[in-house]
Each structure stands twice: as structure tokens, then as C-alpha cells.
């Protein structure tokens, strides 16, 4: 709802087409439960910036999909109900945002229209600030904007006239939210100088043209005609980029931070899948084993309730894929002594054997 309100509010100012709520929750399973399952991408512009906006799920059973969306963010808008206060998944979202490196957050307290008591809204705000502090975000400095996405959206859909600043209080609150996002979330430093890399999010075929892989360019840049390697899960393959497309526009080149579709020469749909990476030749290699320094989250932090031993086989999330791995050895982070068992809260160095090769590099 907020995503739709933002795109429509900004479109009335810029004169561009906004996205209606029904257009954002587009997959059939999303409609069935009235919730956002897969991350949906929209774009919009403020006076100073162009945004690619990922609408992340707010439901605990879709955390896996949120990971694939959150791993791409330069900043986030955390939506909390002003009427109900933070939910259990609010903590999950903050923990996840911290873990995947979302640098800055702006908070939107939604459903302000359902709160009669001003003090109640202030209490919710205090609770949110405390929660931000608990997850190492600056609670005191984080902008918190109140409003009602639904009432703003109704105001925007009920009229055919352009709604400018000052003509509707609920729409103004959405514009104030985006002013704060513009000011508070720093412009990211793009990794354009590094070797090109894009994690594959999705793959589809275009009849008569070939296979297209989509994803966000993590670093470097790519031009039509460049040679790239497809790395991970299967044998590494070399191919040539024959087309680039972003938000329905054909491009000659693309750089870090862009969400693009990439047409690849001589590649079948079966040759490439989500979880692989497309990279500058020789810049990254596939691995089936690695060593990692790990902090095992406690139950209170949203982690495990029980200890685990060597031989434990968890899922490892890397970029856009999850792959099973076997924990081969465990050593104490302090004195490097061999550990038989790891308890939530421990810091350990673990050696892991993966069931499939994936493109990883030293962190």
C-alpha cells in the first residue's frame, strides 16, 4: 500500500505514471493472501534522485524471499503500524537488515488515522527508537514519519487532478517521508571501478532472441559485446552480452546499482539459473568449501534455540541462492581449539563443505 502511495504521490508531482496497488502485488499467490510474497520492483523519482524500490514481504513465512530482496538495498523504509506498534516480524526485519548490510533506515508509522490518542503514537515511536538502538541503528537520529498509506492512496486514486504539495494532508505525509529518505539515506558509493559482477535473480527465454538473465549489477560495468563468464552451480561457461535492458529501455551499457536484463549469446534457458553469477572473466571462481568466522545468534536475537555439532547441515544463503553445506570442523574463535559443540551465542571458525559449487570470494 505504501509503495503504491509513494509512486502515485511522486507521479502527480513529476507528471509520470504511478503504480496502482493491484499492479504491485502481481503474482497469483500474492493476491490469494493479500500479502507481498516475492519482492516487487518499481521505480520512481523525487526532485533529487531516481529510486529503484523493492517491496519486501512483511510476513514471517517469506523471510527467505526477503533475504533476496534485502541484499540489494542502499537504504530501507521500515513500516510499523502506529495502531499496533512493532510486530514480531519488525524485529526480524531489523535483524535481517543489519545482517545483510542495509546502511540506513527511515521509519514510517502507518495507520495514524486509526490512533485517537496522540500519546499512544508517541509511545510507539519510543518503542521503535529503542528497537533501532538494539539492532545498532541510530534510534535517536532516525527520521520517523507518521501517516496513513491507505488514506493517501485513496486521495490519489479518487481524483483525476494532480495533487500538489499542500492540497491533501495524507499525501503531504508521503511526500515528507520521501523528503526524509532523500536527505537521510546517503547516496551510495557505487563500486563501478571493480570487475563486473551480477548475481542472477531470474532467467527467461525470448523467442527468436535467446536467453535473458536478470539481476542487480553488484559491481563494475558491462557493455554490449563484452565477454562474461557464468559461474557457480554448474561448469563455468563463457558467453557474450548481446543486449541490455532496464525498466523497458534498451541500453548500450550498465553499471553497478542498475537492475538489468541481460541477453546472452548461445546460452539455453537450461544452462543458467538463479544463484549463478555473471562476471568479468577470471574475476571470481566457484568453490565447494570455505572457512568462515561465525557468530551464532541466540534465541532472543532470532537465532537457534539449541546447540549443534560437527556434521550439522544448514542452508547457506549467498547472494540470490541458498545451498546446503556440511559443517566439517568447529574451532573456538578465541584460542583456535577444536570444539565438539556450538551453543547459541558462541563465536566460532567453521569449515564448510557445500553440496554444489557456488561463486564466493574472501569477505
UniProtKB/Swiss-Prot annotation:
It catalyses: GTP + H2O = GDP + phosphate + H(+). It is found in: Plastid, Chloroplast. Its main location: plastid. The keyword GTP-binding applies. One of its GO terms (molecular function) is translation elongation factor activity. InterPro entries: EF-Tu_GTP-bd, EF-Tu_GTPase, EFTu-like_2, EFTU_2, G_TR_CS, P-loop_NTPase, T_Tr_GTP-bd_dom, Transl_B-barrel_sf. It is an enzyme of class 3 (hydrolase). One of its GO terms (biological process) is mitochondrial translational elongation. Pfam families: GTP_EFTU (PF00009), GTP_EFTU_D2 (PF03144), GTP_EFTU_D3 (PF03143). Its EC number is 3.6.5.3. GTP hydrolase that promotes the GTP-dependent binding of aminoacyl-tRNA to the A-site of ribosomes during protein biosynthesis. Belongs to the TRAFAC class translation factor GTPase superfamily. Classic translation factor GTPase family. EF-Tu/EF-1A subfamily. This is Elongation factor Tu, chloroplastic. It comes from Gymnochlora stellata.
Amino acid at each position: 500500500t505504501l509503495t503504491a502511495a509513494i509512486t502515485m504521490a511522486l507521479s502527480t508531482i513529476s507528471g509520470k505514471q504511478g503504480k496502482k496497488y493491484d499492479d504491485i502485488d502481481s503474482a497469483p499467490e500474492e493476491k490469494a493472501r493479500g500479502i507481498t510474497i516475492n519482492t516487487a520492483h518499481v521505480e520512481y523519482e523525487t526532485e533529487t534522485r531516481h529510486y529503484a524500490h523493492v517491496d519486501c514481504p512483511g510476513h514471517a513465512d517469506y523471510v527467505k524471499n526477503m533475504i533476496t530482496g534485502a541484499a540489494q538495498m542502499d537504504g530501507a523504509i521500515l513500516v510499523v503500524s502506529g495502531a499496533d506498534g512493532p510486530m514480531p516480524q519488525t524485529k526480524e526485519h531489523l535483524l535481517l537488515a543489519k545482517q545483510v548490510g542495509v546502511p540506513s533506515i527511515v521509519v514510517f508509522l502507518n495507520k495514524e488515522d486509526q490512533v485517537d490518542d496522540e500519546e499512544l503514537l508517541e509511545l510507539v515511536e519510543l518503542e521503535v527508537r529503542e528497537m533501532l538502538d538494539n539492532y545498532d541503528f541510530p534510534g535517536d537520529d532516525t527520521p520517523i514519519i507518521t501517516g496513513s498509506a491507505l488514506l493517501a492512496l485513496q486521495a490519489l486514486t479518487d481524483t483525476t487532478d494532480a495533487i500538489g504539495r499542500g492540497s491533501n494532508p495524507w499525501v503531504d505525509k508521503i511526500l515528507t517521508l520521501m523528503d526524509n529518505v532523500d536527505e537521510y539515506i546517503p547516496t551510495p558509493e557505487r563500486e563501478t571501478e571493480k570487475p563486473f559482477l551480477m548475481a542472477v535473480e531470474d532467467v527467461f527465454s525470448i523467442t527468436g532472441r535467446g536467453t535473458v538473465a536478470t539481476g542487480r549489477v553488484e559491481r563494475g560495468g558491462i557493455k554490449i559485446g563484452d565477454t562474461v563468464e557464468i559461474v557457480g552451480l554448474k561448469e563455468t561457461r563463457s558467453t557474450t552480452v548481446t543486449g541490455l535492458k532496464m525498466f523497458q529501455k534498451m541500453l548500450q551499457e550498465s553499471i553497478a546499482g542498475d537492475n538489468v536484463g541481460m541477453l546472452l549469446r548461445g546460452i539455453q534457458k537450461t544452462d543458467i539459473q538463479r544463484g549463478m553469477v555473471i562476471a568479468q572473466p577470471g574475476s571470481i571462481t566457484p568453490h565447494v568449501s570455505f572457512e568462515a568466522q561465525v557468530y551464532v545468534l541466540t534465541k532472543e536475537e532470532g537465532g537457534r534455540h539449541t546447540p549443534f555439532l560437527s556434521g550439522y547441515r544448514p542452508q547457506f544463503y549467498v547472494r540470490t541462492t541458498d545451498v546446503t553445506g556440511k559443517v566439517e570442523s568447529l574451532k573456538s574463535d578465541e584460542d583456535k581449539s577444536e570444539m565438539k559443540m556450538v551453543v547459541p551465542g558462541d563465536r566460532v571458525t567453521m569449515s564448510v563443505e557445500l553440496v554444489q559449487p557456488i561463486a564466493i570470494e574472501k569477505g
